[in-house]
Curated annotation (Swiss-Prot):
GO terms for molecular function: ATP binding; CTP synthase activity; identical protein binding. Pathway: Pyrimidine metabolism; CTP biosynthesis via de novo pathway; CTP from UDP: step 2/2. It comes from Neurospora crassa (strain ATCC 24698 / 74-OR23-1A / CBS 708.71 / DSM 1257 / FGSC 987). This is CTP synthase. Residues 310-558 form the Glutamine amidotransferase type-1 domain. The lineage of its organism: Eukaryota, Fungi, Dikarya, Ascomycota, Pezizomycotina.
Length: 579
């Protein structure tokens, strides 16, 4: 097993996740099998109960693991399916060590950070790195490890020590450290001191950077590169200038251009890894497709409005943004995403701040498509309901995801079924017409890990042959998508809702839980209880999102026809081979 560690200094949030993902993609183009691990030093066991405004999106994996959003980047770039164990947190490690101590596994010894916590971290990395993550079912060749936060943080120290020991145990040519640092510009001059101090700090902690990736807004000057190389004891060709790019999908192209793949091959002796001609050819095909679908830019745009609750922090909807971008690229357009706070569409804002109210409604009215994503709680939902009503009545393409589907159902119940007080049990537990109810298997007391999580099957129902969404899935009868919710459509209202024109075309295994809703006589009005954004890939966009964006552009029929004709485009495959 070969390891690529991506660490960071100076400040967090400089793009370690994108650089780690890009590195993995480049290795994959050689035909190697690549997996990834994200280390988060926080004490939370997982990201399931974290506030999206503080931490960003909670990404859901196929096994129901609620993790850091960077694991979404890994899956999107590498085309793999990771599991909850691929996200290591301080909380998980200490929980494991304490449980082992309670079971007597340490035979009465004093349990300490060194060696017990350190060994637990190393053992977890070694175990998880060998778990197959693609359909080949084979052990990965390379594991990308991203160390979250910045080296030097108190909470990071056990992980730094563990990674230092892991490097020694892995042996020569089996471990490489890429250190990511920020190069600020002050009065027009690129400053290297922060990078010098960061590298000095990481060296003193025991990790020796082999490559230094300098994040910068503009290309680094040669003098700056030379200064970083000499002060950080690396060669000039081991300094990567990772400047801001028009899209993050061009970062792999930039890194390949700067010779990252050459350095990885040389340091890790990747030419010694035995690969079948089929794997090599497959890797080359992935790279060719990536280069084709990620051009410098598109002349035309598509205007999409996102009506959400957490619009102040765009990372709260990261996977939604990426799914829209993937779909726009597939349709040959650039995404112009317009953010609308759902509260600004409500009557309260009309009275208190008419300017915000009219601005929000102007954006909704002129948009080519309206998206209502997931969320929790009552705040802002009346604005979402009004946006869903506008999309339905004005024939504007609409996609509702999770909560977005639920507000579409509430809107139809109120305005088509004339149940004026229709609402969700989440918003009003005592309302007469609760068309959305709490799932019986959930828990209102224990929030962490108690939702309906992970990959579940959805079955398209007889009579759904008219469905635009079903056609986008290649006329499949059963699909698998990831879920994260506590509430569902009340079965008592299904008949009345369907009589009004809201057709529930997809249901779960029992046939009692509603998963997909669609309006027949509409350009594209779809609601899904699952989260299709979690499985969207750069080379294989999510079907609900692809249909939504294509309908907004006016090319839905063309895209659907191409999907039905191109078997290789379906199910994340190239010529039938999973990548």
């Amino acid at each position: 097993m070969k390891f690529v560690l991506v660490s960071g200094g100076v400040v967090s949030g400089v793009g370690k996740g994108i650089i780690a993902s890009s590195c993995g993609l480049l290795l994959k183009t050689l035909g190697l099998k690549v997996t990834a691990i994200k280390i988060d030093p926080y004490i939370n066991v997982d990201a399931g109960t974290m506030n999206p405004k503080e931490h960003g999106e909670c990404f859901v994996l196929h096994d129901g693991g609620e993790t850091d959003l960077d694991l979404g980047n890994y899956e999107r770039y590498l085309g793999v399916d990771l599991a909850r164990d691929n996200n290591i947190t301080t909380g998980k490690v200490y929980q494991q060590v304490i449980e082992n101590e309670r079971k007597g596994k340490y035979l009465g010894r004093t349990v300490q950070v060194v060696p017990h916590v350190i060994d637990a971290i190393i053992d977890t990395i070694n175990r998880v790195s060998r778990v197959p993550v693609d359909k080949s079912g084979e052990e990965p060749d390379v594991c990308i490890i991203e160390l979250g936060g910045t080296v030097g943080d108190i909470e990071s120290m056990p992980f730094v020590e563990a990674l230092t020991q892991l490097r020694h145990r892995a042996g020569k040519n089996n471990f490489i450290n890429i250190h990511v640092s920020y190069v600020p510009v002050v009065n027009g001059e690129q400053k290297t001191k922060p990078t010098q101090h960061a590298v000095k700090s990481v060296r003193s902690a025991g990790l020796i950077p082999d490559l230094i990736a300098c994040r910068c807004e503009k290309p680094l000057e040669q003098g700056t590169i030379n200064k970083v190389a000499s002060s950080c004891q690396v060669e000039v060709n081991q300094v990567l200038a990772v400047r801001d790019m028009p899209t993050i999908y061009q970062v792999p192209l930039l890194l390949e251009e700067q010779g990252l793949l050459r350095e990885l091959k040389e340091t890790l002796k990747l030419d010694d890894v035995k690969l079948s001609p089929a794997r090599v050819s497959q890797g080359q095909e992935v790279w060719a497709k990536w280069q084709k679908i990620v051009p410098l830019g598109y002349a035309e745009t598509v205007d999409i409005v996102l009506v959400g609750k957490y619009v102040e922090l765009h990372d709260a909807y990261l996977s939604v943004i990426k799914a829209l971008e993937h779909s726009a690229m597939r349709c040959g357009r650039k995404l112009n995403l317009i953010w609308v706070d759902s509260e600004h569409l409500e009557e309260k804002t009309q009275k208190e701040d008419p300017t915000k109210y009219h601005k929000a409604w102007h954006d909704v009215c002129v948009a080519k498509g309206i998206l209502v994503p997931g969320g929790f709680g009552h705040r802002g939902t009346e604005g979402m309901i009004r946006a869903a009503q506008w999309a339905r009545e004005q024939k504007t393409p609409f996609l509702g995801v999770c909560l977005g589907m639920q507000v579409a159902v509430i809107e139809a119940a109120r305005n088509l079924c004339e149940l004026k007080d229709a609402t969700s049990e989440e918003f009003d537990a005592n309302a007469e017409h609760r068309v959305i109810i709490f799932m019986p298997e959930g828990s209102k007391e224990k929030l962490g890990g108690t939702m309906r999580l992970g990959t579940r099957s959805t079955h398209f129902q007889p009579g759904s042959e008219f469905s635009k969404l079903r056609a986008l899935y290649g006329e499949a009868t059963t699909i698998e998508e990831r879920h994260r919710h506590r509430y569902e459509v009340n079965p008592d209202y299904i008949e009345k809702l369907e009589q009004s024109g809201l057709i529930f075309i997809g249901k779960d295994d029992s046939g009692e839980r509603m998963e997909v809703v669609e309006i027949k006589d509409h350009p594209y009005y779809v609601g899904v209880q699952y989260h299709p954004e979690y499985t969207s890939r750069v080379l294989d966009p999510s079907r609900p999102f692809l249909g939504f964006v294509a309908a907004a552009i006016g090319c839905l029929d063309q895209i659907t026809k191409e999907i039905l004709q191109d078997a290789g485009f379906a199910n994340g495959s190239i010529n039938g081979a999973h990548f």
